[in-house]
């Protein structure tokens, strides 16, 4: 088992930095090679259990929060939309505005691809441009909802797919991975009610791939 990159741990919660290309939880095709399995093995040695609060896409890296009992899991999930969830992303092209809020209804097709529709579930995604190079933009993203592939589908719809995202027709793969990383999470601790901020910078290759294309 690979060593977990633990950002924070106490008696109630655990925050881990998930690497890209690792599932958060099991699927029909893969049950073992998941972050959940690694965390469960780690906590089993301490006679503790683990409960999934949320998940990241397989190709997205960054902060994932786990609870250590079902009551805490429910408390965290009930307040999830109140928490601050921020990402850093590298997208193709220049954004239409330096800062904007994208409000779309999202649906999922039979191939599990999410797309913008007049029906579907409402989503709210905020972005702010941090830097640009000749072909891409580095942006900060904050989500107000928690729809599947929300960031990826919304940015692709406005013509700025995340680099490396073949599922949403990205043509650039400058990072040799999906250009999306969950770098900031602010919650209220379910027991102490204290506000807690967790930070986790993207891997070096994330920024090196972007800088390579600057003038």
Question: Where does each model-flagged region fall?
Answer:
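RNA pseudouridine synthases
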Residues: 1-215
